[in-house]
Amino acid sequence: MKICVVGAGYVGLTLSAALASIGHDMICTDKDVKKIGQLKKGVIPFYEPGLSDAILRCGNLSFSSEVKSSMEECPVIFIAVGTPPRSDGSADTKALQSVIGDLSEAIRSYKTIITKSTVPPGTNENIAKQLIASGVSKNLFNIVSNPEFLREGNALYDMLHPDKTVIGVQEEDHVSAAIVKSIYKHIDTPFIVTSLAGAELIKYANNFFLAAKISFINEMARICEAYQSDISDISRAIGLDPRIGKHFLQAGIGYGGSCFPKDLQALQFAAQEKNTETFLLRAVQHINDTQLGLYIKKIQSFFETLQGKKAAVLGISFKPNTDDIRNSQAVRLMERLAELGCDVHAYDPEAVLPEHLRQHVTQHSQAFDAIEESDFLFLATEWSEFLAFDWKKAADIMKGRLVIDGRNVLKKELIEACGLICTGVGRP
C-alpha cells in the first residue's frame, strides 16, 4: 500500500521505517527542507537505537519536503506532527492546523486520514468538520485516530510488536477500521476499535496511569524514609501482584520527557474545559514537581554550603537510550545546583546540554573527566554504562565521598566498599 506520513519527527520516522519494513511503499514528508535533506543522506536528527539502520535498509522509503504533492499521491495519510504544550497547559495544534490546510487542497480522490499525533478529545471530529467547511466532500475522506504508545529507546520494537493497536472511527464510518487493520496485517497485535474521542482519551489515560504509578512509588519512598524501610523491597513485593504489575515502580527523581508532563497538562486542561475536577491528576503532577527538592535537601544535609562545590552529574537525557532532554529531571537538577552555586560538570553518552545551561554547566566527553575532583556525584539517568561503573576508580579521583543515586539502581554495598557514601530515596 502507498502511504504518506506527514511529520519527520520521532513518531513519523519510526512509523515510516516500521511500515516500510513490512512491505508498504512509504513517503515521509516534512516542511523542514534541511531535515529532509539530511534524511535523504541517511542522517537521523535524533538518537534512537536501531532506527538509523532500519531507515538505511528500506529501499521503499523516500523523503520529501513537498507535503501537498506527497499527500496527493497516497490513498492513506498518517499525521504525526508535534502538539507541544502552550503556557496554559493546553495542546498547541498549530502544526496540525497547517496539515489540515494542506489536506484541504490535496484531497482529490478518496483518502483515509489517520492521526498518530496525541491530541485532545474532540480534535479529530473537528478535523473532519474543518475539511468539510473548506469545501472537501465528506465522501472523499474518513478520519481515524490511531495513537502511538512508543517508548523512547525502544520505539522501533514497540511499533512492530505493540501490546495493542487502537483504532478510533466516526460512528458512520464502516470502512476505515478494516483499512487500518490491513495496514498492520503483518504485525501481531490486538485491535481496540472505538470512537474518535475514545481513542484520543485512551492515549491520555495510558500516560496518566503510568505517571501515576511513578508518583505513587515516589510518595511511598518518602514514607519509607520516615520509617527507615527500603522502597525496593516494597516495589518488588507489590509488583508481584498481577493486578499491579512490576513496571514503573522504580522510585527516583521523577518522570520527564516529551509525553508524560505534556499529556497530563493537556488532559487536565481538557477536563477543566468540561468543568470536571481532577484531584488525582493534580496530585500526580504535584508529587513529581516536588520530588527533586527532596534530593536537593539530601545533598544540602551533607554540606554547610553548596557554594563552590563541584557537582558531577551522570546523565542529561530524561531516560536512557535516547538523546531527548525535553522535561529532563537531570536538566532541572543541574539548573538547581547551578543556582545554589555549584560548579556543575556533566556527562551523557548521547545527550547534549540545552543551550541555556552551557554557560553554567561543563559537559565532558568522558564520565571520569566529569567526576575528577568532584565533591559529590549524582546519578541522574540510568544508562547501562553507569550500572557497570568502576567505583574504585571513581573513589580514587573524587575529592568528596558522596554518591547520590537518583534512580535507585546502584548497588550500595559495592559502592560503599570502595570508601564512598551512597544514598538514594526511600532506602536506609
Curated annotation (Swiss-Prot):
Gene name tied to this protein: ytcA
Residue ranges of coiled coil: none
Binding-site list for substrate: 148-152, 203, 207, 248-252, 256, 319
Function: Catalyzes the conversion of UDP-glucose into UDP-glucuronate, one of the precursors of teichuronic acid.
Record-stated family: Belongs to the UDP-glucose/GDP-mannose dehydrogenase family.
Record-listed NAD(+) binding positions: 2-19, 30, 35, 118, 152, 262, 326
Enzyme class: oxidoreductase
Reactions mediated catalytically: UDP-alpha-D-glucose + 2 NAD(+) + H2O = UDP-alpha-D-glucuronate + 2 NADH + 3 H(+)
UniProt cross-references to NCBIfam families, sorted A to Z: NDP-sugDHase
UniProt-annotated catalytic positions: 259 (nucleophile)
Pfam families membership: UDPG_MGDP_dh, UDPG_MGDP_dh_C, UDPG_MGDP_dh_N
GO biological process per UniProt: cell wall organization; polysaccharide biosynthetic process; UDP-glucuronate biosynthetic process
Signal peptide: 1-23
Protein name, UniProt field: Putative UDP-glucose 6-dehydrogenase YtcA
